[in-house]
Structure formats: structure tokens, C-alpha cells
UniProtKB/Swiss-Prot annotation:
<protein>
    <recommendedName>
        <fullName>Putative heme-binding protein NP_2262A</fullName>
    </recommendedName>
</protein>
<dbReference type="GO" id="GO:0016491">
    <property type="term" value="F:oxidoreductase activity"/>
</dbReference>
<comment type="similarity">
    <text>In the N-terminal section; belongs to the ChdC family.</text>
</comment>
<feature type="binding site" description="axial binding residue">
    <location>
        <position position="180"/>
    </location>
    <ligand>
        <name>heme</name>
    </ligand>
</feature>
<feature type="domain" description="ABM">
    <location>
        <begin position="510"/>
        <end position="598"/>
    </location>
</feature>
<dbReference type="InterPro" id="IPR011008">
    <property type="entry name" value="Dimeric_a/b-barrel"/>
</dbReference>
<keyword id="KW-0408">Iron</keyword>
<dbReference type="InterPro" id="IPR010644">
    <property type="entry name" value="ChdC/CLD"/>
</dbReference>
<dbReference type="GO" id="GO:0046872">
    <property type="term" value="F:metal ion binding"/>
</dbReference>
<keyword id="KW-0479">Metal-binding</keyword>
<keyword id="KW-0349">Heme</keyword>
<feature type="compositionally biased region" description="Polar residues">
    <location>
        <begin position="270"/>
        <end position="285"/>
    </location>
</feature>
<dbReference type="Pfam" id="PF03992">
    <property type="entry name" value="ABM"/>
</dbReference>
<dbReference type="InterPro" id="IPR007138">
    <property type="entry name" value="ABM_dom"/>
</dbReference>
<dbReference type="Pfam" id="PF06778">
    <property type="entry name" value="Chlor_dismutase"/>
</dbReference>
<dbReference type="GO" id="GO:0020037">
    <property type="term" value="F:heme binding"/>
</dbReference>
<feature type="region of interest" description="Disordered">
    <location>
        <begin position="261"/>
        <end position="289"/>
    </location>
</feature>
Length: 600
């Protein structure tokens, strides 16, 4: 049998999950002096490790644990196993250890694998993609989030007679992991994770630690993942632990059975502050002063940034620099690729005006912006930055504009979705090109591979007009308008781009389009029907142009783009009997539900 090549891995910090059970009988019987001494030494131990008195890098935290399996958990991340060994034995030397027993433990090491990037086989430092390299470093040198709750569980991949993970081809395993990651990315703004490998270290193959303010977000995430094939077919789980993070100073409250009420402050990817416990990574302490929103808006306007164009933004940053604009731009390009991995990122750009250069970064919330501030403050020649919350903005769940939502409602009333659930709408970036389609497809392939790393990307492909014209289009589908607009910066560099759909000055409503996947047996019939509908459209008042575009790689994947003088003219058609008949016909011939598209 052929020997399968395992995907490359890169390791970072070692992790010890140290679970402790309290001997409550001994604690109740102990004199006050002994209990005070135990709490004093225990608090000193925990605080010293949170403050990294034993190492230059890493992180530590403590959590109360619910249920019978443990009373509290001490979590250590350190550069070496020696550090963990010392931390574990150091606890046993405290007076507090006399009242506890190590009920369980888990040893692992943070890792990223070749499922994220094939070039990882050659090592993380050899990756040419700086954005991906920085993202992976954040995974293996993580900050502990300041979230209220934690969940830990170990897991392995199944090696049974019917389902053996390690017998699958690499491409199949990578596809499983990609789809699995798609589920997790839907919770990226609610749940943080640390993934660590433990083959040869402990009884399972991985240790998973999840952090969230709302514990039901953890439950919802894991529940949804159970239906993903990578879990339902191939995952085996160990015991689960759930608990609440607390400060070392609250140890006495834990032993007194009092509520743990203080706010944690360990810092994370979305936290407001970054404590000293997050060593070993670029500083993410805020490098900006907060100013009035109107003052910041005025400053951004001076550099040509209109905040009204970014309704999703909840916090804005501006860092002026004395360095050359090109040098700053080169640095920001790398940061932007890193920032784009987070759903809370809206936009980061470099602007130059009147001999002044500024890096401007917009985020959905202040916590994420504060972390970004630490990176932006390290830009060449950067002065101390300024930031401000943007009133009425920053809803991380917002997709599209109020006008888009109004259109969605009208389309739903007209049954345009042919039964499609609300909320599956997408944004399409459509660029027309005069280049050879084969050349376009080759150029787009490299970009599409880059886009695939982002959870908001749906697909990108080259389409030819089959009915209604002779243009070639590059189509890129995204969940969010801002993401599509960002993609436009890259796609506009494709060869011989001549126009962007929706930019026709005569068109007052260029947001309407439909994507269809047609059953192969009905393809020819569908095209003929489109011809008939096209004839009806040509006679309609307010209609400018409609084309049927076909994916060059899949002739059954089609895109209908319509341009109208105004929204009212378009909606008149969608309320017409002719369109209703078309929808009924579509229920029979479509392999998938049509998706309404807003042109970005």
C-alpha cells in the first residue's frame, strides 16, 4: 500500500490544563490560620504565573469548573515543557495544594497544520504569504481571551473499519477540514479557540479550548459542528469541562463559595486591553488616544475617507506617519491580509494628502480596533494614533444597507426566492473584460485561491454571455458588501477590465441579479425560456439590459444580470404574471434555489 504523506505542522507554546478538586472536608476542618496561609500562597502562585514571573513568554489563567470532575482549572501556556513541569510542581509546594487533588490534567502544544496551507510542509518561516504567516503565528502564540467562560475537551480522529481518517487522501481530508472551519468561522465574533496537538503527549490527539462570554454560544457551535461530516464520521471526544474565568485575587471567593464577580483582563483578539501575560507576540496594547468622533471624522475626511460609505464600522483609527507613503503602504498591505482574517475588520487603507500620510483602519467594535492599534502603532514613522467610537454603527451582524433590506422584503413578497429561506442573499462583484477568457481564468485562479481563506467568500469564476450580448465577466460572490468591495481592489488588476457592473450612469438600479444552477437535462430548455423572457423585458418601460452569463467551468451555473432605470421599474417586472410563471417553471428545472444578488 502507498505510504500517505502526513501534512506539515508548526508548533508553538506547550499547554497544561491542570484540573484541581478541593477537599472540602479538610478545608472546613482547618484552622483559620492555615486557610489564610493556603489562600495567600495560592493567590501568590496564580498571580505570579499570570504575570509571567517564571518565563518571558506565554500566558496563564484560572477558571472555576462546574460539575463533579473538578472545582477549578489552572491553564498554563509556556515556551517549553520544562516551564510546565516547573509550574505544576511549584503548585504542589504551596500550602493550598494540601487542600486540593489533581483530578485530571492534559498536556498539549499549540499547532497549525498543512490543511491551512500546503506550503507549511517547508516550515512557517518559508511561507511567502505574509498575511497567512502572521495569522498562523497568532494561532500558535495565542493570547488568552478575556471571555467569561471556557470549555475544554480532548478529541481524536476515528480509525475504525468503516471510517478511518488517516486512510483518506489528503485532498479529501483538507476539504473536510475546510468545511468544518466554515462552521467555526460563523461564530468567530462570539467564540475564540485554541487548538493544540497532543499525539504522544496525552491520551487523545488534540486538546480544544473554547472561550465565550455567553456559554450557549459554545453549545450552539459544538451542536452545529456535530452535524458536520468531519465530526459525525470521524471525531471521537473525551470528557468536556465548562467553567468561568476569574482573577487570582478572587481565589478566596471561590473557597468561600461566594460569587465570582470581577471582570477578567487577560486580553485577546477582541479585548480592550492586553496584559503582560500575552508575551511572545507583537504588542497589542492600544497605541492611540481616544478623541471626539466628530474630530476624527473631520480628520478622516481630510484624507478622503467618508465614514458614511462604511455603515458596518463601529470604531475608527487614524495613525499619521512621517515615513514615505509607499513604505507605509507596503507594511499595511501585510497587516491588512492579517486583519482580513477577522470578521470584525471593515477596512484598512493608507492615504496621502498635502504631504501627510495616514493609515486608517475601521472595525466593527472597539475591542478589535484596540488590538489592531498595537500593530498600527508599529508602522514606520507612526506618531501616536487617534481613535473614536462611531455612534449608531458597528453592528457586527449587519449585512447590507437599509435599502437592501427594504428590497429583500419586497422580493420576498413577490415570491422571487422560489421558496428560498430569507438570509441567503449574496453580494456579487461583476467586472467585464475584453481579455481572452482562458487568460482571465488563469489570472483569476490565483486570486480565487487567495480569496478561499476568507469565510465571507463564496466563489469566483469567469462567465461568458450566452444570451443578450458578447461580453466576458469575472464574477466574485461574497456574503458581505464590504468584503466584495475589498476584493475589487485585487480584481481590478485583471487584464483588460473595461467596466464594473452597476456603474452605468443611466442605470438607477443596478443591484438586481439572479444566480441559478440548472439541472443538466433542462439546460437547453432553460436558455430558450430565458430568450422568451428577454423578449418580454425588451418591451418593458425602464428596462435597459439583461444578459444570461454562463460559468465557463460549469455550463449549468448561470448568472442573470439586469439593469433598470430605477427600482420601481424592476419591481414592476417581479410583480408581473410573466415573472410568476417563470418562478413556477424554475421550481422544476433548477438544481438549487436561486439566490438574489446585490451588485457590490
Amino acid at each position: 500500500m502507498p505510504q500517505r504523506q502526513p501534512p506539515g505542522t508548526e508548533e508553538g507554546w506547550y499547554i497544561l490544563h491542570d484540573f484541581r478538586s478541593i477537599d472540602w472536608d479538610a478545608w472546613r476542618d482547618a484552622p483559620d490560620r492555615e486557610r489564610e496561609r493556603a489562600l495567600e500562597t495560592g493567590t501568590d502562585y496564580l498571580q505570579a504565573h499570570v504575570d509571567l514571573k517564571d518565563a518571558e513568554e506565554g500566558a496563564s489563567a484560572v477558571f472555576s469548573i462546574l460539575g463533579h470532575k473538578a472545582d477549578f482549572m489552572v491553564l498554563h501556556l509556556r515556551p517549553t515543557l520544562d516551564h510546565l513541569d516547573h509550574a505544576e510542581r511549584r503548585f504542589e509546594s504551596t500550602a493550598l495544594a494540601e487542600f486540593t487533588e489533581q483530578s485530571s490534567s492534559y498536556v498539549s502544544v499549540t499547532e497549525v497544520s498543512g490543511y491551512m496551507h500546503e506550503e507549511l510542509t517547508d516550515g512557517l518561516d518559508d511561507l511567502e504569504d505574509e498575511g497567512m504567516r502572521n495569522y498562523m503565528k497568532q494561532r500558535i502564540y495565542p493570547e488568552l481571551p478575556d471571555a467569561d467562560h471556557v470549555c475544554f475537551y480532548p478529541m481524536s480522529k476515528r480509525r475504525g473499519p468503516d471510517h478511518n481518517w488517516y486512510d483518506l487522501p489528503f485532498d479529501e481530508r483538507r476539504e473536510y477540514m475546510s468545511n468544518h472551519g466554515d462552521v467555526g468561522r460563523q461564530y468567530a465574533d462570539k467564540v475564540s479557540q485554541i487548538i493544540a496537538g497532543s499525539i504522544g503527549f496525552d491520551d487523545y490527539e488534540w486538546g480544544i479550548t473554547l472561550f465565550a462570554d455567553d456559554p450557549t454560544d459554545i453549545k450552539d457551535l459544538l451542536y452545529e459542528m456535530r452535524f458536520d461530516p468531519s465530526s459525525s464520521k470521524f471525531a471521537e471526544f473525551g470528557p468536556f469541562y465548562i467553567g468561568q474565568q476569574f482573577e487570582p485575587s478572587e481565589l478566596s471567593s471561590l473557597f468561600a463559595a461566594e460569587p465570582l464577580t470581577s471582570e477578567t483582563g487577560h486580553g485577546g483578539a477582541d479585548s480592550q486591553t492586553s496584559s503582560e501575560s500575552s508575551g511572545g507576540r507583537p504588542s497589542t496594547d492600544p497605541s492611540h488616544d481616544e478623541i471626539a468622533a466628530e474630530d476624527l471624522e473631520s480628520r478622516l475626511g481630510r484624507f478622503g475617507v467618508d465614514l458614511e460609505e462604511y455603515p458596518a464600522a463601529g470604531y475608527a483609527l487614524c495613525f499619521e506617519s512621517s515615513a514615505d507613503a509607499e513604505a507605509v503602504s507596503d507594511e499595511v498591505d501585510g497587516l491588512r491580509e492579517n486583519f482580513d482574517h477577522y470578521d470584525t475588520h471593515v477596512m484598512t487603507t493608507v492615504r496621502a494628502e498635502g504631504g501627510e500620510t495616514a493609515a486608517i483602519s475601521l472595525w466593527k467594535n472597539e475591542r478589535a480596533a484596540t488590538t489592531a492599534s498595537g500593530f498600527l502603532g508599529d508602522l514606520p514613522g507612526a506618531a501616536e494614533g487617534v481613535g473614536a467610537p462611531l455612534d449608531g454603527s458597528g453592528d457586527a451582524a449587519t449585512h447590507g444597507t437599509d435599502e437592501d433590506d427594504e428590497i429583500r422584503g419586497e422580493l420576498a413578497d413577490a415570491d422571487i426566492y422560489a421558496g428560498q429561506p430569507h438570509g441567503e442573499d449574496v453580494y456579487a462583484l461583476v467586472l467585464y473584460s475584453e481579455a481572452d477568457p482562458d487568460e482571465l481564468r488563469d489570472e483569476l485562479g490565483a486570486l480565487a485561491e487567495h480569496f478561499e481563506r476568507y469565510d465571507t467568500h463564496i466563489k469566483s469564476a469567469v462567465y461568458d454571455a450566452e444570451v443578450g450580448g458578447d461580453r466576458t465577466a469575472v464574477v466574485s460572490l461574497w456574503d458581505e458588501k464590504d468584503a466584495a468591495d475589498t476584493a475589487a481592489e485585487h480584481l481590478s488588476d485583471l487584464p483588460d477590465i473595461v467596466a464594473r457592473a452597476g456603474e452605468d450612469e443611466e442605470s438607477g438600479f443596478g443591484t438586481m441579479g439572479m444566480f441559478y444552477t440548472v439541472k443538466p437535462d433542462y439546460r437547453e430548455d432553460f436558455v430558450e425560456t430565458f430568450d422568451e423572457v428577454g423578449g418580454l423585458l425588451a418591451d418593458m418601460d425602464g428596462h435597459l439590459e439583461t444578459q444570461l452569463m454562463v460559468n465557463e467551468d460549469d455550463e449549468n451555473d448561470m448568472f442573470i444580470a439586469s439593469q433598470w432605470r430605477d427600482k420601481e421599474a424592476a419591481m414592476a417586472f417581479f410583480r408581473s404574471d410573466a415573472f410568476r410563471e417563470t418562478v413556477e417553471y424554475g421550481r422544476e428545472v433548477l438544481a438549487d434555489r436561486p439566490r438574489h444578488v446585490f451588485l457590490a
